[in-house]
Each structure stands twice: as structure tokens, then as C-alpha cells.
Amino acid sequence: MTSLSAKDKDVVKAFWAKISSKATDIGADALGRMLVVYPQTKTYFAHWKDLSPGSAPVKKHGQTVMGGVAEAVGKIDNLTAGLLNLSELHAFTLRVDPANFKILSHNILVVLAIMFPNDFTPEVHVAMDKFLAALALALAEKYR
């Protein structure tokens, strides 16, 4: 995996500062897309009455997901240690297949490109892709 350079980290932090006010919308859209495009991911949310994009549970969990992304931006210099509790939660309690972190990361990138077309430059795209890959790896840490 490619590590985040100092420049990547600066780009991620600057982009996050621009988009963080829309984090709830980003998370809801990304999660809704994931559930439609990758229907196998619905198994983790079978207890929800409505799995459709824009539903209350999807919006709420999208907000939760993006809260985790915000936490990761704040701990960008040591994601593995900084996200240890989230890694343990997903590995031991929720038992989420870590492959799903990559799927959701992809959907977050899609939504960022749609919602922020002028700010989502190739440089931002690369930095955010590397950041989300590093985040997915940090979340998968306790699966080893």
C-alpha cells in the first residue's frame, strides 16, 4: 500500500475543511449507493426496516460513518493507533468483512466527485483515495 506523504495529509486536511459541513449528506449518499450497487452489504443491516437510499437509518448510519472519517482526519498521523477502538468494534462486535471498507471508500470517492466537482481535482482524488485506503487498512488491523 502507498503511504500518505506530508503533502497528501495536507491535501486531505484542506479538502476535509471544505467539505466537512456536508459530511452527513456525503455519508448518507455513499452508504445508500453501496447498499444498491453492492447488495451483499445489506446483510449487515438486516435489522433496519428500510434500506433504501435516503431512508432514516441510512442517513443516520451515514452520519456515523462520516464521524469516523472525521476522527480519522484528526488522527491522520497515526491511523492504526488512533482508530483502534473502531477496529475492535468492527472486528469483534460487528464482525464486518473488511473488504466492505474498500467498497464504502470507493462510494465515498464517487460522492465526493459528484458533490464537489470543482474541488475534487486529480491531486485531491489521489490524496483522498490513499487516505481512505489507509483508513480501511487501519480499520482492518484487528482482523489479523
Curated annotation (Swiss-Prot):
GO biological process terms, alphabetically, are: cellular oxidant detoxification; hydrogen peroxide catabolic process
InterPro entries, per database record = Globin, Globin-like_sf, Globin/Proto, Hemoglobin_a-typ, Hemoglobin_oxygen_transport
- Where the record annotates domain Globin, the positions are 3-144
The positions annotated for binding O2 are: 61
Matching Pfam families, A to Z?
Globin
- Top-rank taxon, per record: Eukaryota
Tissue expression: Red blood cells.
Q: Name one GO cellular component term.
A: hemoglobin complex
Alphabetical list of Gene3D superfamilies matching this protein = Globins
Record carries keyword ATP-binding: no
Which residues does the annotation say bind heme b? 90
Iron in keyword set: yes
Q: What does this protein do?
A: Involved in oxygen transport from gills to the various peripheral tissues.
Q: Which family does it belong to?
A: Belongs to the globin family.
| Complexes and interactors | Heterotetramer of two alpha chains and two beta chains.
Q: What is this protein called?
A: Hemoglobin embryonic subunit alpha
